[in-house]
Amino acid sequence: MTRPLVIIFLTILVNLIGFGIIIPLLPFYAQTFGASPVAIGLLFASFSLAQLIAAPVLGHWSDRWGRRPILVFSLAGTVVSFVMLALAKSLAVLFLARIVDGLSGGNITTARAYIGDIATPENRARLFGLLGAAFGLGFIIGPGLSGVFAHISYTAPIWAAAAITVVAMLLAIFWLPETVHRVDAVSVSPWTALRELGGRPNLRLLFLIDFLYWASFAVYQTTLALFVARRFNFDATHTGYLLAAFGFLGVIVQAALVGPIVKRLGEKRTLMAGLVFAAIGWGGSALTHSLPVFYLLLVPGALGIGFCNPSLVSLVSGAGGRHEQGRVQGAAGALESLGRTIGPVWGNGVLQWAGEGVAYGSAALVLLGTAALTSRYHVSRRSHAEAAE
């Protein structure tokens, strides 16, 4: 890999380790403040709603001022939010901390735009596969550390996440080279840009697919801790180890399989296969009460997420021009945040009122519908020419 790729990979990896520490812990931590499943869903949703507001703005700013300063700002906001979480004395402070993180949460969107700047049509899927591998590694190391530190206290993993995110911020400040120049920066409302991009036929359906996938994924991600706690009596430590194992499977899929599969099937068919695999994993989990079977169902789940994430991101990136990657990724990030706002409330609400199996089953059905929509999407490289006009 080139130096910019190495640094952006390490920056995002370290940041995602911090994020991976928080995810399995947050539901258990929130319950110590008296949070119900619905309140936990709203806690996850508050982050995504704040990100929904901020993501297009940060994407536009990254086009105007450069990727690196926006990435540093986002990482700094994450550090502040983790400190607030660790020092919280009430559920209200937990909500405030997640909102702060969401408003400054442009790190992944900016990283996608950064990779879009340096990618070519030939290596785009492979480079986004590496970003996916960073996700996978982050979700091996992060949840594993969360499980280890949870033996000490619920706040110990949060302090560890804050320290790790400081390391990511320092990497971005001192070693990450810039990819765009502050030229031809037009002051366009990010929401106007979102409407304009959504008006393109090649992006409108793709944005809908993107939204539905991330809403379904948010159901899985934000209900997993309560799912395994209710069905298999897991605690925060065991949930962290479970997510670490799932992350390990994801690394294998995204680092070793995505490139060859995309080369053979193309991005669209890889995405369709991923949606079906994920539906099998989540739908099967909804039906089983056997822990060994649940473990086996992690395999199609990991294949699904491993195929979907890089192929979907690559399709979105390929549908926008090189000079507008910040706007495209910011708009996509806004819709993904909308999905991650609705998904936790949907998933945790259904879990509280109808049971954890119904929550997972509903997400699996939406994934199958999304696969059907994906079959109607026509990949067109003319979008680059359209964007240049």
Could you say what each language-model-derived stretch is?
Residues 69-84, 269-284:
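Structural signature of the two symmetry-related core transmembrane helices
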Residues 34, 66, 87-92, 233, ...:
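Helix-breaking motifs and short loop linkers at transmembrane-helix boundaries and internal kinks
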